[in-house]
A protein has these predicted regions:
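Alpha-solenoid helical repeat scaffolds
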Residues: 1-206
Length: 206
């Protein structure tokens, strides 16, 4: 905490010639807080960044992601919907909102519609493909989910895709394959919270 306070003080002490410099200083501080896992403080500070450029969808998207990390799913949803209202083809917002709904197990048909719309704009994106697989799993379409998630993982060996693919395999009774995928995920990032939570919830030990 002492080092964090020191680093924040250094950022704040940097000279700023105008509004753009001031915003960049705030963004540097937000990034520092994010890296230290101080998501609530990062979210609050990002709100100040957004207030300086409220029409900047990328800044609002960053605030939405921090709202999610800070445990504010409704606020995340509000921010993402505000982006989509302004820019309906902002596929990152469509995907993030669809995935959030799917992950919480709410409004699953809307989640699927949002993710399919995101895929129209970015059909090769493995993370959006992952979201589609996850919503299909939540809808109970496990075999379809498996095929989609295998495609996503083939495109991108990502730890969170591994967590989802492993869970679908586990639910289908393919436990050895699930454990193998999770081991791959742990090799990519053994500290990932999504994978750790999945393993704990399922009582699995790769």
């Amino acid at each position: 905490q002492g080092r964090l306070a020191e680093a924040r003080a250094l950022i704040r002490a940097m000279p700023a010639k105008g509004a753009d410099d001031e915003r960049m200083k705030l963004q540097a501080e937000v990034q520092l807080l994010r890296e230290m896992g101080q998501y609530q403080q990062a979210y609050e500070l990002q709100a100040k960044v957004v207030a300086m450029a409220p029409q900047d969808n990328d800044l609002v998207y960053d605030q939405a992601m921090l709202a999610d990390k800070a445990g504010k799913p409704q606020e995340m949803e509000r921010l993402l919907r505000s982006i989509i209202a302004r820019k309906p083809d902002y596929h990152h917002a469509l995907n993030a909102l669809g995935f959030s709904l799917a992950d919480r197990g709410v409004r699953l048909q809307e989640a699927r519609t949002l993710i399919m719309k995101a895929l129209e704009y970015a059909p090769e994106d493995p993370f959006i493909t992952d979201s589609l697989g996850w919503v299909e799993f939540r809808l109970g379409n496990r075999k379809e989910a498996l095929a989609i998630l295998e495609r996503a993982f083939k495109r991108q060996q990502d730890v969170e895709i591994a967590a989802h693919l492993g869970e679908v395999l586990w639910s289908l009774g393919q436990r050895e394959r699930a454990l193998a995928i999770w081991r791959e995920g742990l090799r990519i990032n053994q500290d990932n919270s999504t994978l750790k939570d999945t393993l704990k919830r399922l009582g699995a030990q790769p």
